[in-house]
């Protein structure tokens, strides 16, 4: 099995378990416990599902962490021997919030050409896919792309900065914690909807995925990675303040520790290996012609090593 593993994550507390894994060297610990004491672990950070998918396809990393939408697109693209990408576990259920600083925008129906919506990657990011699902819910499947022309690709921290500045063309932001929390403290910014409204309940936002070749050739390494993720989840649950301290130490973000603890402890946020509501996203992407292959259940998107989880 390999003696080095490279992982990429993105921005926000929906990646918190991975930040904890890096800081606490949990993969190294779990690998050592499995007879691999010299495991080298390298972490990178990118923005948007497209870029983490490209990193995996280019063999620049062994594991990518990204939204359920980008996973499904990659699963579809790499099926039948072209990499056969699947998820090894879920990372987080975190609501994404669509915010606006245009007082005229109370619901999706109020968006017009006067609005520009920042999100991590147009068309492909989980925010973009959820916006399409919301549009399809409101206007029918044929109109799922109705709001796409208003969207702009932008890193969450930059989108938040634009919203809070009150300047520039960006007057809406589809984001997640901690950025939505920070923005909503500004009285000029309000919530239009969140992803749990669209999915009808909690939904996994982030999953961890790799190729079949890597997964099958390195079962002990994969076991160590998933065990490390599980350990991180336990630490977050047992000690949210410690998790918040780790997040701030690694990311150097400017959120207050108390705000972070409140977010991490929110009943709407869950860090666990079992996925929630991933299958409806696969159905939507297939129905709207974005992916060719039809998943028959959430298990199609995950390696058999994850099938014992009580997922959806």
Task: Spell out what each predicted region is.
Residues 14, 23, 48, 52, ...:
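Stable alpha-helical elements in mature extracytoplasmic
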Residues 36-41, 142-149, 251-263, 292-298:
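Short, surface-exposed acidic
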Residues 16, 92-98, 189-190, 204-208, ...:
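Small-molecule pocket liners
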Residues 215-292:
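Secondary-structure end/capping motifs
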Residues 1-144, 149-153, 167, 171-177, ...:
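Short, glycine-/small- and polar/acidic-enriched structural segments
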Residues 285-312:
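Conserved C-terminal helix/tail region of periplasmic/extracytoplasmic solute-binding proteins
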Residues 148, 157-249:
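Pocket-lining segment of extracytoplasmic ligand-binding domains
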């Amino acid at each position: 099995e390999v003696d080095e593993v490279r992982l990429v994550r993105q921005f926000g507390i929906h990646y918190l378990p991975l930040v904890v894994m890096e800081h606490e060297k949990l993969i190294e610990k779990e690998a050592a416990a499995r007879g691999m004491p010299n495991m080298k672990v390298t972490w990178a950070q990118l923005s948007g599902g497209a870029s983490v998918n490209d990193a995996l396809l280019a063999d620049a990393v062994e594991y990518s962490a990204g939204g359920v939408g980008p996973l499904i697109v990659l699963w579809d693209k790499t099926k039948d021997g072209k990499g056969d990408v699947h998820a090894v576990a879920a990372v987080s259920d975190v609501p994404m919030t669509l915010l606006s600083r245009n007082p005229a925008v109370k619901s999706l129906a109020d968006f017009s050409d006067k609005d520009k919506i920042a999100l991590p990657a147009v068309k492909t990011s989980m925010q973009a896919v959820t916006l399409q699902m919301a549009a399809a819910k409101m206007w029918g499947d044929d109109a799922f792309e109705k709001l796409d022309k208003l969207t702009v690709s932008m890193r969450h921290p930059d989108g938040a900065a634009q919203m809070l500045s009150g300047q520039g063309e960006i007057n809406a932001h589809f984001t997640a914690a901690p950025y939505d929390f920070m923005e909503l403290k500004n009285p000029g910014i309000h919530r239009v909807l969140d992803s749990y409204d669209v999915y009808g309940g909690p939904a996994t936002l982030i999953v961890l995925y790799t190729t079949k070749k890597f997964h099958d050739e390195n079962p002990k390494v994969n076991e160590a990675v998933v065990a490390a993720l599980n350990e991180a989840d336990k630490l977050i649950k047992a000690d949210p303040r410690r998790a918040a301290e780790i997040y701030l130490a690694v990311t150097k973000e400017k959120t207050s520790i108390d705000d972070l603890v409140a977010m991490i402890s929110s009943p709407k946020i869950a860090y666990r290996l079992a996925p929630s509501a991933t299958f409806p996203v696969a159905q939507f992407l297939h129905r709207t012609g974005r992916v060719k292959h039809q998943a028959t259940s959430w298990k199609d998107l995950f390696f058999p090593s994850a099938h014992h989880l009580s997922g959806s």
